[in-house]
A protein has these predicted regions:
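Extracytoplasmic beta-rich repeat domains
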Residues: 3-27, 48-76, 97-114, 138-161, ...
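Residue-level marker for isolated small/hydroxyl-bearing positions within beta-strands
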Residues: 32-33, 82, 120, 169, ...
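Acidic (E/D-rich), amphipathic helical modules within compact regulatory domains
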Residues: 117-127
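Beta-propeller domains
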Residues: 81-99, 106-109
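Short loop/turn segments that connect beta-strands within beta-propeller blades
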Residues: 3, 44-47, 92-95, 130-133, ...
Length: 209
């Protein structure tokens, strides 16, 4: 009937944040991030906190304009996310304890496939990570075809995986297609003259906005 069941107020920052909120549902928990890097799990029926994990020090409250965090993704057991403070996290979905942290500078949404995690750093490196231990398996420079001056201006927007390819869109309107088996760039396509969205794959078709 549209009646409010419960509400939960999150921490407010003192500045306007560039960080986007993210929310996922795992079993009986609503799990979300906020602008200062806290990850909170709420009981979906009662609205009470199940657990909360602050990922940043208290000083981040005054620096939230520059803080960016990726969307949360999960395999049902672990929650994966990263930020532009050189931190890539895996935490236990049941209790919020940290499984591992790796030094990766990225605020785009990571992708979980089987026992692997794929992400692209803000500097344009495709990084393949072993999901359980956080070991980096492979690193591929996707921006190596750009001149240094151009490279400094370009940031990844988002990625998607279809079959054995990864598709990465960038702020320059180009899409990079990567062969995941070989770890090499297959081609670079100009999609737009300017900023485009992350790619979406539906029924073997790729969509960007």
């Amino acid at each position: 009937d549209g009646k409010e069941i419960w509400q939960f107020k999150t921490e407010e920052s003192f500045t306007i944040s560039n960080s986007k909120f993210s929310l996922i549902i795992i079993n009986d928990m609503v799990i979300f991030s906020n602008s200062i890097g806290d990850i909170t799990a709420i009981n979906i029926k009662t609205g009470l906190i199940t657990w909360q994990l602050p990922t940043q020090s208290s000083s981040i409250i005054n620096e939230t304009y520059n803080f960016k965090i990726s969307k949360l993704v999960s395999d049902g057991n672990s929650i994966i996310f990263s930020n532009n403070k050189n931190e890539f996290h895996s935490i236990d979905a049941k209790n919020g304890t940290i499984n591992w942290i790796n030094e990766i500078n990225s605020n785009i949404t990571p992708i979980i496939t089987g026992n692997l995690i794929f992400t692209v750093s803000n500097e344009g490196y495709l990084i393949v990570i072993e999901k359980n231990k956080g070991n980096i398996i492979r690193v591929t420079d996707l921006f190596k075809y750009y001149k240094l001056k151009e490279r400094k201006k370009i940031k990844p927007v988002g990625s998607a995986i279809g079959n054995t390819n990864l598709y990465l869109t960038n702020t320059d309107g180009k899409m990079i297609v990567v062969d995941l088996n070989l770890g090499v760039v297959k081609r670079v396509e100009k999609v737009s003259g300017d900023f485009i969205s992350r790619p979406f794959i539906v029924n073997d078709n790729i969509f960007v906005i």
